[in-house]
């Protein structure tokens, strides 16, 4: 296909065999090497890892819960954000530490207000499906500058005003992403 003779390619192929990038087998020919580049192997593994394989349990609060209760949940669960759901359990919004801090700072009535007053509302919530790759999830986190994403599946309930409804099945965070990178770096 390249229009090159075998003797011309032989020295290049011999070098690739010595590096372990390809294997030479008599009567078979050349195949991908068993000592494939660790970086290439790691990136293939990362591209094939799905969110559902690494997601954590969601930390959920109802939209009628008070801001005070949300702050307590945030600290008790040791998370950076809470996923807010409606009475049917569908994604309603998300509330972060920053949201709570901005709302409560200097506001004496903040603790009794419902979280629905403070949260980022759906459809403005960035989320991910369980079947997306962790690379896609990481891109969303970086592009939208968020620390975590709710993992959602389409709800069996009807849409509200043309907006799809989502059931929350998990969450993926920067900590999970960092753990994935660390596991790859140390070869687990």
Where is each model-derived feature located?
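ATP/adenylate-binding site constellation spanning eukaryotic-like Ser/Thr protein kinases
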Residues: 27, 76-79, 97, 174
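N-terminal helix-turn-helix
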Residues: 1-24
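Cytosolic beta-strand hydrophobic patch enriched in CBS
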Residues: 8, 61-62, 80-94, 127-129, ...
């Amino acid at each position: 296909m390249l229009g090159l003779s075998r003797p011309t390619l032989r020295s290049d192929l011999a070098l690739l065999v010595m590096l372990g990038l390809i294997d030479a087998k008599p009567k078979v020919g050349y195949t991908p090497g068993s000592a494939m580049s660790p970086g290439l192997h790691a990136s293939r593994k990362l591209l094939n890892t799905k969110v559902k394989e690494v997601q954590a349990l969601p930390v959920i609060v109802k939209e009628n819960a008070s801001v005070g209760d949300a702050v307590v949940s945030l600290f008790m669960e040791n998370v950076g954000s809470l996923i807010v759901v409606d009475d049917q359990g569908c994604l309603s919004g998300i509330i972060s530490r920053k949201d709570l801090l901005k709302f409560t700072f200097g506001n004496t009535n903040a603790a009794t207000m419902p979280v629905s007053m403070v949260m980022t509302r759906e459809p403005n919530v960035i989320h991910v499906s369980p079947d997306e790759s962790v690379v896609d999830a990481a891109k969303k986190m970086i592009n939208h500058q968020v620390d975590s994403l709710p993992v959602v599946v389409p709800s069996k309930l009807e849409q509200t005003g043309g907006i799809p409804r989502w059931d929350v099945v998990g969450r993926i965070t920067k900590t999970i992403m960092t753990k994935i990178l660390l596991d790859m770096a140390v070869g687990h």
